[in-house]
Amino acid sequence: MALLSALLLLFSSLCVQQSSCIIPLGASLSSATQTTSWTSPSRRFAFGFYNRGNGLYVGVWLDGNGKKANKVIWTAKRDDRPFTSDATLKLNEIGVIVSTAECREMIFIANENHSDAYSASMLDSGNFVIYNKDNHIIWESFQHPTDTILGGQSLLANSQLISSLSENDPSAGMYHLRRQNDGNLVLYPLESEDSPTTAYWKAETYVTNVANLSLRLNSTGVLQLINNIDSSVYRTIHLSNQEESYSDFNESRSNNSKSIVYSASLDVDGNFRLYAHVFEPNGGFQTYAMRSALVNSCKIKGFCGFNSYCTFNDNRPFCACLPGTDFIDPNQNTIGCKRNYSEAHCKGGKANIPLYNITSMQGIEWTTGYILQ
């Protein structure tokens, strides 16, 4: 037993010294045990099962090491129902599969090229990759972003980020960020047509006569349009709004012994934000919101949900219900309002008319292209 422990310790130390830890075919994780993830060499990133709301999901996250909450970076099959506590994840020749006691095996991460998987790694870049027997990457999570990109990751032309439904539900939410073929970076409500009338923010990065461009968040937290052919920087994208915690981040950054990981996320509220995650020497990390696309969140179409309106005071958005309605959930004011009275029908066009009235509200700006129901 002592020899086995020593060998495991030796493997762990060698893994940390390398740029990746190789996960062999047949390796598995179980949600019912303490081994629920595979970590990167630095242990800053992990891939495996994570808890969210009332279920389990498979994804990649920044590991808070028990000192801070984990920051989820990517979720696999985000719109599928969550797994139960008896799920098992395994790497085999077709990729990563997940099985449970209540359903048959399913392919969770497939190889688009139908190449045979041979091994996998959770890299220190935050990229989970699958290799073939020639050690070539045949699948990587960086090519399938959900709502976040990391420093060193790119968003290709006509690709998108989609916000999560809520902080406790990683399924697709209400907004998406598109890297359009014309080079522009644009925010739209997800359930509307992508057109100039429905867009609520754009980076003004139109490009003419230049193809093969991608949006890249570099390792120092700068968003850039990159030429995919020669990796040259075509244009830098600036998020104009400086967040309140920006000055705190600058103070923290002055300590050179701390390492920083940058991320850019389309958050639940529809705003696109740049974050810095500063790792502490004793483990864990501190997250700072640095910049965002919009100063006024009320400009985000549908920010307050159905039957409600948004006001912006003291640099903060506030949602309020239209007369005759109350919040669907008082603890989540952004999901909208519902009628607070019993419906009365106007039979023959006359009955119950006294129960209805039309009320005018002053100072309301109707947002073109988004219809309340």
Task: Please provide the spans of the model-predicted regions.
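Beta-rich ligand-binding surfaces for carbohydrates and other polyanions
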Residues: 2-373
